[in-house]
Amino acid sequence: MVCEALGEIKYGDKGNMTTAEIDATIDFLIKAKQDGQFRAFWKSFDESVNLMASGEVVIQSMWSPAVTAVRTQGINCAYQPLKEGYRGWGNGLALMSHLEGMKLDAAYEYLKWYNSGWVGGFIAKQGYYSANVETAKAALTENERGFFYEGKPATADITSPTGEKTNSAGDKRDGGSYEERFAQVAVWNNLMDQAEFLYAKWNEFNAA
C-alpha cells in the first residue's frame, strides 16, 4: 500500500501479487531498510508492546490487542485511519474430518459456546470483531456497543477485557463504526499463489 501510495508500483491485486510485483516490493523495502527507515522487526506480541510503550518507535504494524495493552499503560496509542485503506485479516474455526461420536459432539458444543457471545464480547474489548456480530454485541454494555461497534463517543470509561482503563468518556474509536471500518479494507491477508516465492524474498529482506 505504501509503494502504491508513493506511485512506485501499481498492483493488479495486492492480495495476490505476481512474482514481478513481489520482486519490486521487496527491492523497495530493502532500499528503505538500508536507508535506516526501520527501527526494529518485532517477533512477539510483548516485543511490539514494549517498542511502542517505551517510545522506541512511534509508528508500527501492531495487532489490535497489542494496541489495547499499550493503552492500558495510559499511552494514547491508536490505529491511524489511512486514506489508502486498511489491511484486513480474519480467522475461523473448522472441525477435523476424522471427528466422530462424543468428540464430534464436544467439538460442536465448543463451536456453539464460541459463537454464543462471551468470546465476541471479550475480543471486542481488544479491538477485534466476531463473525457473529449480534451475540457479541449482546455481551457488551450499551456504552461498549456504542464505542466499539457504532462509532459513538464513550459515555463512560472503556476498559480492556481484564478491567484496565483504555479510553475515557467522550473518546471515539479510531476509524469509526463497524461498517465504516470494514468499508475501508483495501486488501485482505491471504495465502497468495506465489506464497513460496514471497517467503523466499521476505527472507532476503530480513537478511539485507
What do these predicted regions represent?
Residues Q37-E100:
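Extracytoplasmic/periplasmic substrate-binding proteins
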Residues M1-I9, G90-M96:
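Periplasmic solute-binding protein
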Residues L95-R173:
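Mature extracytoplasmic/periplasmic domains
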